[in-house]
Amino acid sequence: MARAIMFQGTGSDVGKSVLVAGLCRVARNRGLKVRPFKPQNMSNNAAVSDDGGEIGRAQWLQALACGVPSSVHMNPVLLKPQTDMGSQLIVQGQVRGEARGRYYQELKPQLMAAVMESFAKVGDGADLVLVEGAGSPAEINLRAGDIANMGFATHADVPVVLVGDIDRGGVIASLVGTHTILPQEDRAMVRGFLINKFRGDISLFDDGLAAITRFTGWRSFGVVPWLKAVSRLPAEDSVILERAVRGDKKALIVAVPMLPRIANFDDLDPLKAEPAVEVVMVPPGSSLPADAGLVVLPGTKSTIADLLALRENGWDRELVAHVKRGGHVLGICGGFQMLGRRISDPAGIEGNVRDIEGLGLLDIETMMEPEKVVRNVEAVSLLHDEPLEGYEIHIGRTSGPDMARPFARIGDHDDGAVSPDGRIMGTYLHGVFSADRFRHHFLRALGVEGGQMNYRESVEEALDELAEGLEASLDIDGLFALA
């Protein structure tokens, strides 16, 4: 079994995913064969791994930081929320059904075998495995049968480092409180802590570090400052979208309705990085900005439910007004399905609504079918004759007259649809804006000159900068010696 260290948080969104990605790059730069692992993830931001299954995009990014192909075994259990009470269950990359509330709690102990099998496969040939927990180990109401945090750590005998987020406040209480509430067996697994997202003079927190150690007996591995490189990396949790604020007006405003079950929102990251583009996330209850040149309907885990939510917010009427003003629309995956005349779900795959009228902006119809398409693809944009690399994760088959004007060609078949005037576009492909030449041509067609950024290189540079920041702020030797 490979050496391993597990990073657990005092809560969600404390920065574990990016921290592990940065430490993966640190270990790689030190010449170690390092691999990422997350026993259980809950996210609709999924990736298609290099071996052809679904994993969290955070683990895909961590694999990139390690310089290795991504694998379904890096995230053996993935939960994709599709209703308020249930999630689609993905085990080792493949759909296993729906997990609902208490039923999933009863199912978790059975999943430990798959988790441990994947952990062994990830560790095979590795010098170090960096493990990421989920949520917080302090949620002791979920401790029985746990596979995500201390349940895994105790089962696999992996030492734990706790991560506290000082930016949200109360970090001393959150760490000391976690120490207090953990059962003795779990507390014994914790070897220390680190503080994340500090702004200002770190020396001002010296007394805080001493207080945490005094109350817990845990050693400090350091304080990570607020690192600008993090903003250039894909975010895993949609909570980060809720904090977006409008900046100075740019040449092109791209409006994105924040659908309740938004998925794969990192499709937007390359656009956000363009200096002439402002991506505006529009929360429920707010209107689409009238000055938007492009509206993107993003992917969603539940197309029909989110189409209903779109209508409840009045965004359907605003979208029609946007088109009448000469605006453009791009639908991606579930957003593409919404643009059509009708969505049918006779088997009730998505829920109780069997048939619903679409937005009618494209002359297409979608039939939901049980078979799920999960694959990485190489394609050619038929709008601009430029190569694309992306991935598909969807159910449903779409057809109709506007499919005669496809968005892209994948091998021997076409993808997507374009309206006769070219202003309404839809595709099943995620990741299209990561292709620099396509992105620049796409923006130019909207009257905006794209920058010279190479998006993939910018992600690699951000990982290197993150690693440098962690080397400078943490006791890396002490951390890696835990394994």
UniProtKB/Swiss-Prot annotation:
Protein name, UniProt field: Cobyric acid synthase
Free-text function comment from the UniProt entry: Catalyzes amidations at positions B, D, E, and G on adenosylcobyrinic A,C-diamide. NH(2) groups are provided by glutamine, and one molecule of ATP is hydrogenolyzed for each amidation.
Assigned protein family: Belongs to the CobB/CobQ family. CobQ subfamily.
GO biological process: cobalamin biosynthetic process
Domain GATase cobBQ-type: 251-438
Active site: 333 (nucleophile), 430
Keywords, sorted A to Z: Cobalamin biosynthesis, Glutamine amidotransferase
PROSITE patterns: GATASE_COBBQ (PS51274)
InterPro entries with a match to the protein in the record: Class_I_gatase-like (IPR029062), CobQ/CobB/MinD/ParA_Nub-bd_dom (IPR002586), CobQ_GATase1 (IPR033949), CobQ_N (IPR047045), CobQ_synth (IPR004459), GATase_3 (IPR011698), P-loop_NTPase (IPR027417)
NCBIfam families tied to this protein: cobQ, PRK00784.1
The keyword Amino-acid biosynthesis is assigned to this record: no
Listed pathway(s): Cofactor biosynthesis; adenosylcobalamin biosynthesis
Domain of life: Bacteria
GO MF entries: ABC-type vitamin B12 transporter activity; catalytic activity
Pfam families: CbiA, GATase_3
